[in-house]
């Protein structure tokens, strides 16, 4: 103000600037009023008092929002919107930038959806804080203020500083949280927010709103989001443990009827908001149900179909299922009558829990006649099928051509939008490319099929172009249908759909009625069954990997039965990996005609996944809406030579110890050469066995050493089951085997040196001696021996202590695996950690997202 007093002519500019600096539609409105008032008065006019501009409004950095109103205290908010203590309470978090712009339709929508389902809501809005600590009042402090409370005095406001000083003391008002924020929730206060989320122990959902992709473009796109948007919309929130990235609002343009100005505002996508609200409701239901009331579906992998194929990547699935059943029983779940051993469980699963291929109708009848096998009335499935989006239905019944036909019809509703039109063309091109790629796997029909696919693509592009330019679409539609009929007459397996419900996959007839066979076993409130097969015709592998062919009716029916008839409160997929997260359509930001979303339904999904399966695990989180609970890899050990390789090593050892003058030297050399020829390893090490020399013996020995230093898994891991000390020692030894040369030596290099050996020139015999001593010393350390009693080498002692620490983390993982699963089934929060194999990320171990 002193500046204005000195330069009064700048007063109007400063007044306008204050409105702008404080932001928000109400301030912009009053800024415009002030501008008009000054202009009117300067030109001799009068300004009506009803239009007098208000003073600039400063919004607080911590507030609650509802129905267009802002509240600065929880007491004030609860006076207007009291909580029902018998119902779940959902927190909502968003930045003040959208409130300042008056663009809160997405907030209003999710509040309406949640309250319509009987849930309480506490909608928090806070300021952004860029650099940690520069803005003490912000979205993070707002969440602390409105979501936490002092158990001794619930009405007292808790500050962020108080909370951080004693996080274990405070309690929480919410059962779940919805985040509308991109990048990180809590803005600059990343670590503090991470601690808050972990302590609240509630699921945190990612409700995505886009500023770049309109609804039509999103619906028609094949990627869902731009790859650059995926980073800040999904990947960054995932690092905070935020789950289920669901696309709920898009920008929509409208023209103001008074001014003619184009207005862009967030518009909720109502069916997506409903979907999010249903999923939130089912997650918090896990908190409110007692364990005896909960129904759980355990889903394992049976590929290819048949009795001998129950498994997952490096996981002992039968033993894992038994351990999970025991844990559920101990936790009070209604589960009984299950086998006590994995062998007995396998017998039951191979009798009643397998998929049966269409070429084995006799086996299907045997399965259908088993006691307690589930036969789902095809009419009930048909009723469920009719609830699916018409695009998905058409794709199942008629195949990929029916799908692309319906997509173009959808595109006609958005053809005036440049971005939607481009998305439709891109989807057409990708569809064409994928169709031709699949057609090429059938050489006898590939050429004819490829021509027709290209013709259909061009006809559909002409439909879109004609509609966009106001021309008739009749002719290109007619061309398309002619090509479609000709294409379908080729009868290329997988391309013509699965026919009308219920199809012919795993269906039987009883007394004139059709039924779909749902393989699986029920133990009380726990259903155990195989994920259905992705494809059934001709070459199963082709359809398994297809991105254009819909899953069969029985596949959809199986998931529909689990979600709606058995009415599972949660799905638990066991091991890497299932197929539902790989089904056709969008890469991320799925819609209601994307099959992964259809199969996930609205029920919570927990996925037991190997800790090093990072890339594929992302698919299960983003497309399968799964919460991952990692499991350890099996123990890893250096490779043991066997058979002829072991004999070869012995020959080399004998040869190296034989004096050069001995007549046996040449005989041993010839024996080594013959063994190299027998094992056919000469090409691998680039030697010529017809001209075998002493130098080649050294190359063969180096090859054997390389094999012995290669890590390999030992058996399979059983989820939640502890290892022996020997197995823990093997993995700990593998972790400390990473060698950076003399400047950053591995434990094995140091031990080799202590034994008087050159680590870079170890023979196969020496390599085995070094590996054995390494594991033995670590085993002794695990069992309580002090490293100093084994060696006085400071570097070895340091690495032995490090190995002991890794062994501790490994042992912690076993109990944490099962505890994390049970916590997820209680509607809890699974803390995120970066994944990878234990060798690269020894501190990651397992049990995290």
Q: Residue locations for each model-derived region?
A:
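Ligand/cofactor-recognition surfaces for anionic moieties
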Residues: 1-849
